[in-house]
Amino acid sequence: LYEDGHMTKRCQGNQVRCGVAGYFDKTAGLECRKVHWSAANAKKHEGLEPLAITISNHMKEVSPKTYEFQKSKINKDYIFKDSIFSTMTINYDYRTATHRDKGDLEGSLSTLTILEELEDNYEGFYTGLPEYKIMFDIRNGDTLIFDAHEFHSNTEYIVKSKELEKDDMTGQPFAGRMAV
């Protein structure tokens, strides 16, 4: 809202601690390439490869058809080494509104893996699929395999400990939850 009372056509969401590692798709005449973070942090990018392999192995075990489908579609030059994944989106302590993911491989499933800096440091943060009226309590090391093109979200959460640093934006202590 402007000072004179008329509405702006812009909107601003809350700032989110998130990042992308891996590779961009080919777009607007640009070839596939590493995202800036991965290009600038080659050793850290390589450090994510064991996690990508572990998540790939979960997919292979739980949904072998999806694993083989995704494997048939990948370009081996643009993946985390020895995995089926080209990209990792990383969200820290972030509650999402109900949404559908875009940009993922159509006809495939997605993974959501939780890593906790301090185990059992929060209550809530359930991942929900509202159309199916189901929620999951995904915890440290767990991987959920689901269709992220379906509506999904996660719930509010309460941080139990003040052991971790505080968020500069909110002043609240971090839960220490990373969703990959």
Describe each model-derived feature in a short phrase.
Residues 1-111, 116-118, 135-136, 158-180:
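Fe(II)/2-oxoglutarate oxygenase catalytic core
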Residues 113, 136-151:
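Conserved metal-binding segment of the jelly-roll/cupin
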Residues 116-139:
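A short beta-strand-loop-beta hairpin characteristic of the jelly-roll/cupin
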Residues 152-156:
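Short, ligand-facing micro-motifs at secondary-structure edges
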